[in-house]
Amino acid sequence: MDDGGRHDTSIFSGRPSDLIGRQIAGYRIEREIGRGGMAVVYRAKDLRLDRTVALKLLAPELARNDTFRGRFTHESRVAAAIDHPNIVPVFEAGETDGVLYIAMRYVAGRDLRHLLDREGPLPVKVAARIAVQVASALDAAHDHGLVHRDVKPGNILVAQGTDSDHPEHVYLTDFGLTKKSLSLTGFTSVGQFVGTLDYVAPEQISGKPVDGRCDVYSLACVVYETMAGKPPFQRDDDMALLWAHQYDEPPPLTEKRPDIAAPVDDVLAKALAKSPDDRYDSCLAFVAALRVAATGAVETGHAPTQVDRRAVGAPEFSPPPDPPDWARPVFPG
């Protein structure tokens, strides 16, 4: 139980540092390690089992929505049942003093966002090693009926690997709170949709039903960024970016990375197809095609990726309508 038995809003009131040292649901808060619009993640100590965990606390208003609470319970149980080396294990999910929480394995690594910000575009072999581990995790989730819907560098943790042949161990996180739960319960604001703009599939934008192929699209956006340094679509405002995902063709990766084999462009174009039916059927099928296409790539002599130890052929479509001025690229031509 929460120490002091205070009301749920006390957990989210004041400064984040106010929670340091407090006990919540049998966990002692040590420090904040991540924050989003609907949740805060802390490193915490499991006082019952004497282990370090990542404890995610959801915004109190989520617990007050019965539909969300039901889906949260179901999806957390499904996520906890997935035993996969590239998925962060969920230890426990529950509610205390009106706040929903998820306790997960604490991964000693940094996320892919941090790695890209620090190192820029990655060598093809490094990008492929990361991609295949994420793809394996996603396909395992799909086999259990879970679609992630928010694959992005910030949800991909990169930890130290076991040896020189496996220098990175990658974990996919944020399965206990899939974005469908938020969309079904009204926790999206007017003018917003569920997903992260740079990586969202066209069908998510249009509100159509989604399956694992939306994760194929998002993974392809991430893979593109790992090798190009930027996501495939760069626009000057959110509406233009949404338009690009729905109607614009992705720029060939080889324009930014001429050292990469040309067939990689075709693989990425298929994975980034506007229609799910024109994409690869699975994430691993996409990455397998990517690795085959990249065999002719010329490595540029980058040093091996140093993982931070402190923490962890395009299908044809009918021509789209001409975009309005606000939807044109920031750097046309």
Label the predicted regions.
Residues F12, A63-T67, A159-P209:
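Activation segment of protein kinases
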Residues K45, V132, L138, D198-G301:
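C-terminal lobe helix-coil module of Hanks-type protein kinase domains
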Residues A59-A81:
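AlphaC helix of the eukaryotic protein kinase fold
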Residues A81, I130-A131:
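Hydrophobic/aromatic scaffold residues of ePK-like serine/threonine protein kinase catalytic domains
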Residues V134-L146:
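Protein kinase catalytic-loop region centered on the HRD/HxD motif
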